[in-house]
């Protein structure tokens, strides 16, 4: 086991490790790297931590304090900066003195070199370097969340499809009938289930009633002898049909069409949509591996021991189908980051208040002389996608060997 872990670890060349560590650090520490507030300040003879305090205010844990309204370049005399961030701007900070596309090589209106915009500004005076930092955080979370979602869904359906196939899954007629009745109730227009509820309690109550209705019907139908009879469920055939349906859809176009359905497009909703169209690929590989190992001697042995299907899948099948999942996860992160940047570049990604690599490149597209708005985010995007693909290739080579 130790030798196997070392072999996978050697797939990380030194430069790939440093890029991934740096990307992760920016994703976690972005407010400490680029911020318009000091990390540690002295205000009215008291020590404060504005960045930490702002987190508490945003979370509703602690009340707002007077010193949070001051910025690094605009503060009274009794406001002393003890420790400041590396970049004295947030991604959305407006510097009116350096608006209208200030070049990183040109003249800038600054009081000291600390406040210089090292990678230039956009039309509103927002710092490009700060935008790269916060864009790295957005790319990290979208890539990781979308990939995690696709892995969870793909693993579940791939394992179930490969293990049960078309001849091992059975369900009673009563369960099928109860499920159909509940589905008709959900789709019914007469009782208003199709309208979105704004009250969380009302939503929970409706779903609770649905579950109760299903259980009640299930109990009643199972008292009828003819409905107790079990019928086979061709799970593998159904899974392949779903996979074929997903493959026939242009994923990026469908994501673009579904985004307007969300009232506010955030990281979670965007990752959900991207992961929705990534899981079939992982599910295919998991199904193929499961079909390969399900008739091997060790799988037949654990079945003869009387272990439950859940324990067989989790303890014995999952470790054997995991390697191809890891390989596809590396490619999936790069693909998710590329899709997020493409959507933001087209103005269809996150909200207008979110700065991403795609929105920076979109701003550069509107004014061609501002080359820094396309070059630097493009380089960052290329490095991340390239690293993910190289890592996936190396893991694939290790897996095949």
Where are these regions (language model features)?
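Non-cytoplasmic
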Residues: 252-284, 325-359
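A hydrophobic, multi-pass inner-membrane permease signature
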Residues: 235, 247-254
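Transmembrane alpha-helices
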Residues: 137-153, 254, 291, 310-342, ...
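Transmembrane helix-loop junction
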Residues: 159-163, 260-261, 288, 292, ...
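Gly/Trp-centered helix-boundary motif
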Residues: 1-155, 159-230, 234, 314, ...
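Residue-level signature of the transmembrane alpha-helical core
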Residues: 21, 132, 144, 148, ...
């Amino acid at each position: 086991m130790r030798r196997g872990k070392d072999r996978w670890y050697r797939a990380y060349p030194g430069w790939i490790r440093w890029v991934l560590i740096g990307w992760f650090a920016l994703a976690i520490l972005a407010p400490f790297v680029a911020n318009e507030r000091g990390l540690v300040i002295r205000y009215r003879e008291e020590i404060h931590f504005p960045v930490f305090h702002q987190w508490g205010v945003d979370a509703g844990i602690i009340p707002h304090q007077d010193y949070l309204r001051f910025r690094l370049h605009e503060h009274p005399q009794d406001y002393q900066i003890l420790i400041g961030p590396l970049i004295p701007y947030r991604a959305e900070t407006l510097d009116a003195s350096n608006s209208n596309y200030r070049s990183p090589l040109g003249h800038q209106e600054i009081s000291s070199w600390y406040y210089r915009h090292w990678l230039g500004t956009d039309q509103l005076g927002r710092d490009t370097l700060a935008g790269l930092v916060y864009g790295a955080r957005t790319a990290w979370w979208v890539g990781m969340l979308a990939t995690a979602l696709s892995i969870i869904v793909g693993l579940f359906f791939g394992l179930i499809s490969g293990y049960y196939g078309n001849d091992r899954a059975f369900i009673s007629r009563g369960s099928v009938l109860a499920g159909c009745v509940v589905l008709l109730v959900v789709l019914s227009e007469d009782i208003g289930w199709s309208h979105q509820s704004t009250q969380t309690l009302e939503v929970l109550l409706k779903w609770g009633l649905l579950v109760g209705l299903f259980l009640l019907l299930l109990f009643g139908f199972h008292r009828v002898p003819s409905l107790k009879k079990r019928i086979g469920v061709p799970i593998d055939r159904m899974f392949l049909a779903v996979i074929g349906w997903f493959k026939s859809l242009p994923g990026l176009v469908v994501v673009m069409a579904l985004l307007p359905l969300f009232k506010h497009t955030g990281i979670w909703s965007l990752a959900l949509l991207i992961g929705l169209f990534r899981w079939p690929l992982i599910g295919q590989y998991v199904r193929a591996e499961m079909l390969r190992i399900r008739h091997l001697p060790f799988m037949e042995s654990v079945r003869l021991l009387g272990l439950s299907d859940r324990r067989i899948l989790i303890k014995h099948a999952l470790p054997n189908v995991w390697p191809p999942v890891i390989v596809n996860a590396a490619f999936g992160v790069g693909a998710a980051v590329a899709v997020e940047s493409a959507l933001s570049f087209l103005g269809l990604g996150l909200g207008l208040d979110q700065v991403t690599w795609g929105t920076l490149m979109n701003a550069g597209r509107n004014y061609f002389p501002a080359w820094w708005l396309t070059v630097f985010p493009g380089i960052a995007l290329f490095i991340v996608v390239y690293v993910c693909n190289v890592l996936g290739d190396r893991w694939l080579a290790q897996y095949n060997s």
